[in-house]
Structures are given as C-alpha cells and as structure tokens.
C-alpha cells in the first residue's frame, strides 16, 4: 500500500533446504530483492545447518562471546558466500542472533565489508548464564552511531566503518525493555486491566 522498503535479516539456515524447497525459498527471497527490499545477514551459528555444513563443524552457542575473532570472521565470510551463491548479492547489513554482538564481531563485520549492524538493544543484557549471552547494558544511546573496534559498547570512540542502528528500547517501571509489539500488547492489556 505504501511501497515501504524493509531489511530482512536472513539466517543462512534456509539454504540447508534441498531441491524444490530450496528453489522455492530462493525464488521468494529473489522476489523481495526485485521489490527493492534489502536482505541482511542474521547470525545463529548454533542452529544454522548450512553454515555448519559449509564449515563441516557443529557449533554450540548463539552468542559471539563464545567465539574468537578467527571463528567469527569465518562465520561471517562463509555466510556471506552462501547468500551470494544463492541470491547473487553481497549483504551489507547484519544482526547477530539474540543481539549477541561483541568487539571481535565488529572487527569481522568491518573486515567483510558490512556497513550496518542492528544488534544493539541499549540498556539491556540477558541470558548471562547460557549460550545466548548478550550485554548492551553500558549503552544508553537510542540513535545510530559508528561502532568501536575497541569496545562494541563504546558509543564515543566511533572508529569503525560500521554504523550501528540500535533496536528501540524504553524504560518501564525501572526496567529497560525492547520496543516490541508483544510488549505493546502486554502493556496495553495491563493498563486496560488496572
């Protein structure tokens, strides 16, 4: 209706499909590209069978915290190649699964030509004791900034070429929450009830 364009962050796991199913997926994604939508990369090493098959290895964690630069760089480079092989594009936007970016991931993104990341959830950290660990608790900015190659949460020393476009967050009764449609419905229901 409004001809709005969107970025779809894609896990390369979809490329683990075979034959007719893979063709169907690729055709759907190519139709999005024809409509001028963007396909970005969404990283989930632990559940991405296409990535695991390409690297001939299983990974146990979502969070970048559990991987070194070399591993992260390999994930990003291989996933980018999978997207190019299947869709003929080189993605330039990125979101780490479960918002679990870290400083090594920022370096890998820059080294692989990514221009935009959208993993930050300012003021929020979670899954501190499991494989989906993420921490954006030091960030209190809700506007875009260039990521730091020294500390991914540092919004002042913007020395990378990767622009962070954070996910909207808000404070509610002393707790920082993602601006998520589910929360909107829950908050509306709570206000209606009380």
For the regions a language model picked out, list residue spans one by one:
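Surface-exposed, active-site-proximal loop segments in enzymatic domains
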Residues: 16-21, 50-66, 178
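CE4/NodB-like, metal-dependent polysaccharide N-deacetylase domain
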Residues: 3-5, 64-98, 165
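A structural motif corresponding to the C-terminal end of an alpha-helix
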Residues: 2-4, 31-36, 82-89, 152-160
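Active-site-adjacent pocket scaffolds in enzyme catalytic domains
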Residues: 96-194
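Acidic-and-aromatic substrate-binding clefts and catalytic sites of carbohydrate-active enzymes
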Residues: 12-25, 47-51, 95-103, 126-127
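Hydrophobic faces of well-ordered beta-strands that scaffold small-molecule active sites
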Residues: 6-8, 39-43, 92-94, 116-118, ...
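Generic structural signal for well-ordered alpha-helices
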Residues: 25-30, 73-80, 106
């Amino acid at each position: 209706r409004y001809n709005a364009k969107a970025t779809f962050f894609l896990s390369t796991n979809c490329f683990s499909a075979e034959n007719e199913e893979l063709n169907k997926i690729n055709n759907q994604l190519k139709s999005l590209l024809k409509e001028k939508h963007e396909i970005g990369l969404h990283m989930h090493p632990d559940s991405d069978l296409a990535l695991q098959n390409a690297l001939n290895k299983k990974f146990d964690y979502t969070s970048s915290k559990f991987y070194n630069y070399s591993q992260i760089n390999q994930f990003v480079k291989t996933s980018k190649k999978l997207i190019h092989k299947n869709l003929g594009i080189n993605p330039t936007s990125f979101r780490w699964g479960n918002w679990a970016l870290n400083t090594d991931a920022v370096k890998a993104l820059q080294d692989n030509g990514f221009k935009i990341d959208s993993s930050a959830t300012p003021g929020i950290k979670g899954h501190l004791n499991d494989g989906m660990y993420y921490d954006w608790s030091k960030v209190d900015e809700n506007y875009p900034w260039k990521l730091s190659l020294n500390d991914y949460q540092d919004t002042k020393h913007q020395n990378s070429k990767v622009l962070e476009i954070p996910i909207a967050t808000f404070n509610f009764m002393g707790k920082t929450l993602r601006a998520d449609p589910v929360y909107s419905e829950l908050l509306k229901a709570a206000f209606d009830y009380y």
